[in-house]
């Protein structure tokens, strides 16, 4: 299973459902057959939803994932102690599906800014595009992009820009990194400016 890293804001924008929840039970279930008629197994987590940040008007009861990490299956702690932020795809009927490529992290590892941004701020930036910079030099190709530099500057994708910044559209239609809750003003120097 391989996936490219995403900024938490991208994960929020790409997901159908974003919730804070804990897993209370786990079992293997059949979910139809593959093209050769073999049964497809999935793991079903029964969860207790604590808060929904994005999604349908109903609580999520079950989360499904593939049976092993080799096929991108996610392993959650059951027992109802550990809380997670879980972003994933809707399956209807109060169910969702997650893979290792989705944004799933223990709630207590999120920064205060990330937790606050889930309520409104990431949504404000969903029209912007976050482009990961794998090596210097890298450039934006349009004004609605923000360069995500964590990998280059700190050799880790879960660093400064991921923890403390959102990429928000300004009044002139361009996008810029911003730390705080109001939309950024034009006079701030963009991070990608030389």
UniProtKB/Swiss-Prot annotation:
One of its GO terms (biological process) is negative regulation of membrane protein ectodomain proteolysis. The keyword Cell division does not apply. It is found in: Secreted. Residues 1-126 form the NTR domain. The record marks 14, 35, 41 as: Involved in metalloproteinase-binding. Residues 1-4, 69-70 are annotated as: Involved in metalloproteinase-binding. Disulfide bonds join 1-72, 3-101, 13-126, 128-175, 133-138, 146-167. Zn(2+) binds at residue 1. Keywords: Disulfide bond, Metal-binding, Metalloenzyme inhibitor, Metalloprotease inhibitor, Protease inhibitor, Secreted, Zinc. InterPro entries: Netrin_domain, TIMP, TIMP-like_OB-fold, TIMP_C, TIMP_CS. The activity of TIMP2 is dependent on the presence of disulfide bonds. GO terms for molecular function: metal ion binding; metalloendopeptidase inhibitor activity; protease binding. Its main location: secreted. It holds the Pfam family TIMP. CDD domains: NTR_TIMP (cd03585). It comes from the Eukaryota. The keyword Zinc applies. One of its GO terms (cellular component) is extracellular space. Interacts (via the C-terminal) with MMP2 (via the C-terminal PEX domain); the interaction inhibits the MMP2 activity. Complexes with metalloproteinases (such as collagenases) and irreversibly inactivates them by binding to their catalytic zinc cofactor. Belongs to the protease inhibitor I35 (TIMP) family. This is Metalloproteinase inhibitor 2. It comes from Oryctolagus cuniculus.
């Amino acid at each position: 299973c391989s996936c490219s890293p995403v900024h938490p804001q991208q994960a929020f924008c790409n997901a159908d459902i974003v919730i804070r929840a804990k897993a209370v039970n786990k079992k293997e279930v059949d979910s139809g057959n593959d093209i050769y008629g073999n049964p497809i197994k999935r793991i079903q987590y029964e969860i207790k939803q604590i808060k929904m940040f994005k999604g349908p008007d109903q609580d999520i009861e079950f989360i499904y994932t593939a049976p092993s990490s080799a096929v991108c299956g996610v392993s959650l702690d059951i027992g109802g102690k550990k809380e997670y932020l879980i972003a994933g795809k809707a399956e209807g009927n109060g169910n969702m599906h997650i893979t290792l490529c989705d944004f799933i992290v223990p709630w207590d590892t999120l920064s205060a800014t990330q937790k606050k941004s889930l309520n409104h701020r990431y949504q404000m930036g969903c029209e912007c595009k976050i482009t990961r910079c794998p090596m210097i030099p890298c450039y934006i190709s349009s004004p609605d992009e923000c360069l995500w530099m964590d990998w280059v500057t700190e050799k880790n994708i879960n660093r400064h820009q991921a923890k403390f910044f959102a990429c928000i559209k300004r009044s002139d239609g361009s996008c810029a990194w911003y730390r705080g809750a109001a939309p950024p003003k034009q006079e701030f120097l963009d991070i990608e400016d030389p």
